[in-house]
Amino acid sequence: MPHRKKKPFIEKKKAVSFHLVHRSQRDPLAADESAPQRVLLPTQKIDNEERRAEQRKYGVFFDDDYDYLQHLKEPSGPSELIPSSTFSAHNRREEKEETLVIPSTGIKLPSSVFASEFEEDVGLLNKAAPVSGPRLDFDPDIVAALDDDFDFDDPDNLLEDDFILQANKATGEEEGMDIQKSENEDDSEWEDVDDEKGDSNDDYDSAGLLSDEDCMSVPGKTHRAIADHLFWSEETKSRFTEYSMTSSVMRRNEQLTLHDERFEKFYEQYDDDEIGALDNAELEGSIQVDSNRLQEVLNDYYKEKAENCVKLNTLEPLEDQDLPMNELDESEEEEMITVVLEEAKEKWDCESICSTYSNLYNHPQLIKYQPKPKQIRISSKTGIPLNVLPKKGLTAKQTERIQMINGSDLPKVSTQPRSKNESKEDKRARKQAIKEERKERRVEKKANKLAFKLEKRRQEKELLNLKKNVEGLKL
């Protein structure tokens, strides 16, 4: 029977791959316990060359496998409103679960294994995260009430029943300010200083500043004079920020006001008026000639001058009065004394001395220079490291054998003395015997070299195998 090709269970060309990812925090089903928290995300098969060509259109020239186009967003075009179906989480027990059909393969999967089509603008984690810092979009009164700084017992903080009508009415201060603005606009650019002084003198009486009741009761006083007296046009600024505290975002409660006052007192010390001496041009005023204060100042001046004066019986050269009287005499009596400073000796305590008597903590040792280890060379013929294995000498049996060879196999013909009456035939025979002996000696020498070489190689291999076996048996 012909062998049939088995059909694969999954066709890679038509297959659809998914990534198992966590459900988005903006997904409405993220808070549903019955819905799975992990969903399937279809993978998009994009050719690398096509993706890189698309990236080059937008100026991305990185040659790697990362998809930089996922960070780009298409510009929003004209938008239109379309009716959307309301999303509702289905109960598995009551209603059947919806199925999603993948058009490329025709696979039907439940919709719960995929992410929701509609997502919220803010995720669950951002909704639960607390907001830190001042909230400028909140009413300061609401912030003060949340911080327990709002005084509910204060009658000024209570609203009347007709607070809307009262808020729409113009108060007396606003009317006064309107009158003041109109008068300021009518004023000319140049003013007479004498007239201002005359007007300002009318605003004060012998008792001091005018109170609010006095201002209201005094007839003929203009709104401008009252405003100048009450400093309506002046705004107190902070020395620290150069801004008025009314422009602050936070409502100033009692503790913050106390904190601001302390800062103001602290920065008053660094005002220009408090630094250095005042100029003489700014000092004004007068004092009587026979006043006690002037007499005390003169007495202090004469007393200080008398202390610095020294009466001399005879005329002497003027010396520096700031120096002490006996300073010159003491300088003459000074002598140079040489002091020898001895080097402080090292003092040993009992514990240090006892430690030198034993080798428990005292380990005297000579520091030696360790030479660099030699490089290991490997034989090209045997593959065994050279000069690593120990060299063995000849055994007693091998030495005895060599001695026997040396005693018995010595060349006899070459050592025999030549006769003086030797004939030509004897000489020719003797030379031929020497040649034969030398030839045999060369053959024997070559055989011995080969035998020793093979024996050396065999012994090196045995030692190497023995060393490997011993290392393998270590525990």
From Swiss-Prot:
Biased segments, Basic and acidic residues type: 419-447
Ranges of Acidic residues composition bias in the record: 184-213
UniProt superkingdom: Eukaryota
UniProt keyword Phosphoprotein, yes or no: yes
GO biological process: ribosomal small subunit biogenesis; ribosomal small subunit export from nucleus; ribosome biogenesis
Phosphoserine carried by residues: 17, 24, 248, 331, 408
Tissue distribution of the protein: Expressed in the epidermis.
Coiled coil: 418-475
Similarity field: Belongs to the LTV1 family.
Function, in words: Essential for ribosome biogenesis.
Disease per UniProt entry: Inflammatory poikiloderma with hair abnormalities and acral keratoses: An autosomal recessive disorder characterized by mottled hyper- and hypopigmentation of the skin, sparse scalp hair and eyelashes, sparse or absent eyebrows, and palmoplantar keratoses.
PANTHER family: LOW-TEMPERATURE VIABILITY PROTEIN LTV1-RELATED, PROTEIN LTV1 HOMOLOG
Protein name: Protein LTV1 homolog
Natural source organism: Homo sapiens (Human)
